[in-house]
C-alpha cells in the first residue's frame, strides 16, 4: 500500500496529491487544493468529517517537490504491516513531525482552519462510494449529527 506515496520523492514530480480510489473529487476539495497550491506551504492536509481524526489520512494529502525528498527511505525504514490503519501510524510517526510547520491544513472539526468553500449538503472530501456509486449512509449520519 505504501508504494503509492513514493512519487512524493521523485525529481520529475512537482506536485503529488494522494487520493483513495473509492472517493470522488468535488468542488470543496478543488478549492482547498487551489488555495494550497497558491500558498507557500509544502504540504497539504484535509480533514472534512468527524472521523477524520488522524494527523494525515492516506488519501487526503498533497506535497510539493522538495518537501519530502527522502519519502522512499522513510517508507523503507518504517516497519510495514499490511493492516488497516498502518498508513495512519506511518504518517503520525514518520511524516507529520517533519511537515507540521510547513503545511496548510483544511479542517473544520479539529483545528478550526475552514475550507475555502462552504459544504454542499452532506458531501465531504474523502467521501467513500462503492462500486454502485452509493455512499456509506453511516458516514452521512455521523456528519449530520456534527454539523446540525
Cite the ranges covered by each PLM segment.
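Conserved donor-nucleotide/metal-binding helix-loop-beta segment in metal-dependent transferases, i.e.
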Residues: 25-56
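Catalytic core and acceptor-binding pocket of nucleotide-sugar-dependent glycosyltransferases
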Residues: 50-51, 60-148
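Conserved glycosyltransferase catalytic-site signature
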Residues: 1-5, 30, 87-89
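Small-molecule pocket liners
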Residues: 15, 41, 58-61
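Active-site acidic catalytic loop and adjacent metal/ATP-binding pocket
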Residues: 21
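Extracellular/periplasmic catalytic domains that process cell-envelope and extracellular macromolecules
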Residues: 9-11, 37, 53-55, 135-136
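Active-site-proximal specificity loops/subdomain of glycosyltransferases
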Residues: 1-15, 24
